Amino acid sequence: MRLVTTPRVAFLRQVADDVLARIGRGRVIVAIDGPVRSGKTQLADDLADVLRERDLAVFRASSEDFHRSREAQAAYGPDTAERYWRYGIDESLLDRTLVDPFRMAGSTAFVTRAFDLVRDAWVEPKWVTGPADAILVLDGRFLLRERLRDQWDVAIAVDGEPTDAADRLAYAASDPREVAAIVIDQSDPEHPRRAGAR
């Protein structure tokens, strides 16, 4: 289905061209990182829609849906920004149930959501499969941290200064804008623009 052409959609079509020029066939993961309230989830949703416009198999997920429960996080110490930055997302769960099985292709099933952050509760997993050629658009804070960034085929960062304490810790350790292939300025969400690229 063709999307209505707006300045945002036209820009994201250019981003999609760039993404597709950087990848080959098979299973591909595009990761979008950025500070809290930067619009990364909406960007991921919109980019996925633009990629689907080209009749590509596209899946969406957010690292927010792979959190540790508050009880599990408490095992790592008091509720601080550092604890959240280090242990808020269950990276092992993300890998085991989404990233690794998605990469395996074939009939291997994966889940795009495992945890409800608002309810602080696990969700019933919905296992899905996809074709051999498919794109996963994954958004979330801290995805371009050093220990995760090599898992992604294309890394996108939303431009913006961190205002949250956990984001400030993450950016002090590794600014996602410095390692992303594509950096997007969404200060005007209806008229996003490139802020940089590698």
Question: What is each of the regions a protein language model found here?
Answer:
Residues 39:
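Conserved glycine(s) of the Walker
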Residues 43:
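Hydrophobic positions on the alpha1 helix immediately C-terminal to the Walker A/P-loop
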Residues 59-62, 68-119, 135:
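Conserved nucleotide-sensing/catalytic segment adjacent to the nucleotide-binding pocket
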Residues 46:
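Active-site signature of alpha/beta-hydrolase-fold catalytic machinery across serine-
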Residues 1-30:
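Extreme N-terminal, non-catalytic leader segments
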Residues 49-59:
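Post-Walker A helix-loop "phosphate-sensing" segment adjacent to the P-loop in P-loop NTPases
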Residues 2-12, 142-198:
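Conserved NTP phosphate-binding and transfer environment spanning the P-loop NTPase/kinase superfamily
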Residues 35:
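P-loop (Walker A) phosphate-binding loop of NTP-binding proteins
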